[in-house]
Curated annotation (Swiss-Prot):
CDD domains: lytB_ispH
Binding-site list for isopentenyl diphosphate: 41, 74, 124, 226-228, 270
Active site annotation, chain numbering: 126 (proton donor)
Residues binding (2E)-4-hydroxy-3-methylbut-2-enyl diphosphate, per UniProt: 41, 74, 124, 168, 226-228, 270
Paired cysteines (S-S): none
Cofactor note: Binds 1 [4Fe-4S] cluster per subunit.
Pathway this chain belongs to: Isoprenoid biosynthesis; dimethylallyl diphosphate biosynthesis; dimethylallyl diphosphate from (2E)-4-hydroxy-3-methylbutenyl diphosphate: step 1/1; Isoprenoid biosynthesis; isopentenyl diphosphate biosynthesis via DXP pathway; isopentenyl diphosphate from 1-deoxy-D-xylulose 5-phosphate: step 6/6
Protein name stated in the entry: 4-hydroxy-3-methylbut-2-enyl diphosphate reductase
Stored InterPro entries: LytB/IspH
Keywords per UniProt: 4Fe-4S, Iron, Iron-sulfur, Isoprene biosynthesis, Metal-binding, Oxidoreductase
Reactions it catalyzes: isopentenyl diphosphate + 2 oxidized [2Fe-2S]-[ferredoxin] + H2O = (2E)-4-hydroxy-3-methylbut-2-enyl diphosphate + 2 reduced [2Fe-2S]-[ferredoxin] + 2 H(+); dimethylallyl diphosphate + 2 oxidized [2Fe-2S]-[ferredoxin] + H2O = (2E)-4-hydroxy-3-methylbut-2-enyl diphosphate + 2 reduced [2Fe-2S]-[ferredoxin] + 2 H(+)
Protein family according to the UniProt entry: Belongs to the IspH family.
Amino acid sequence: MQIRLANPRGFCAGVDRAIDIVNRALEVFGPPIHVRHEVVHNRYVVEDLRQRGAVFVEELHEVPDDAIVIFSAHGVSKAVQEEAKRRQLQVFDATCPLVTKVHMEVIRYAREGRESILIGHAGHPEVEGTMGQYDKSYGGDIYLVEDEADVVALTVRDESKLAFVTQTTLSVDDTARVIDALRQRFPAIIGPKREDICYATTNRQDAVRQLALECGLVLVVGSVNSSNSNRLRELAERCGAEAYLIDEPSQIEASWLKGKAAVGVTAGASAPEDLVQQVIATLKNLGGEDAEEIPGREENIRFSMPKALRP
C-alpha cells in the first residue's frame, strides 16, 4: 500500500504566528496567560499550550482584572476589543492578518454606507468576529449567507449599495458558486479583487484534489471544530475518494485500508506535522510503504510578531 503525502499541508503562517504569540507570552510573562477561545482549532495544540500554562476562556468576563489576554487567530468583534480596552487588560492580538484584512473591508464598507454580505458558516468564531466589526451606526447592516439558498432568501435595504466578503477557510468551489449567485441576484454588488479565502486554504484544497485522484482513501489530520480541515475531507469525498477526519493515529481503523492500493494523508492548517508523522508511522505498521510527497506549491509567507513579544 502506497502512502502519498499532500503538499502543502498543516500549519499556515497565521497559525504559526498565533501559537508563537502564546508561547512567547508564556516565556516573557510566565503563566497564567489567558487566551480568548482556542487559539487555533486543534485539540493537540490547545492541550499542549494548556499544559504550559495557557488558560483558555470563551468570554472576557472569565479573565481576571490586570491579566494578560490573547485573542485567538480567528479574530474578535469590536465589542470584545472595546471591553478589553475598558478593563485595561493587556492584550496581544493573535488574529491572523488575513482575517484582519477582512475586518478592514467590512469597516470600510460600513463607513461608505454600504451594507455587507458575509459568506461563512454560522457560529464559527471568525464569522462572529467579522460580523461584529461592521459598524451599524452608519445606518447599514451585515448579513450572513452560507449557500445559494440563503442568497435567494436574502432581503437587503438598498441593492445598489452592497458589498460581500468571505470567511477565510471556506471551500473554494462552494464559495465561487455563492459569489456567482450574489452577482446574479445583486448586479451592483462589489467585493474584494480576489475572494478572501486565504492562500493556505486554497493551496491545501488544490493539494487534496490531486491526492484524491491518486488515492482511494484520504486521511485528513485535524480536529472536528476546524473549518478548513472539514472542507478538506468534504473535497476529497467530492473528488471520489473515501475520506476521514482524524485527530490522532489511534482513530485509524484497519478496515478503512482493506483493498486500498494507495492512501493519501494531509493535514488542516491548524494540525502539527508531528501528528502527520505519527499517522504515517501507524500506516506503515499496517502495511504501508515509505511515504512519498506529491509535488506542490511552496509556501514561504511569514507574519511578524507583536513588537512587545519579539526577542
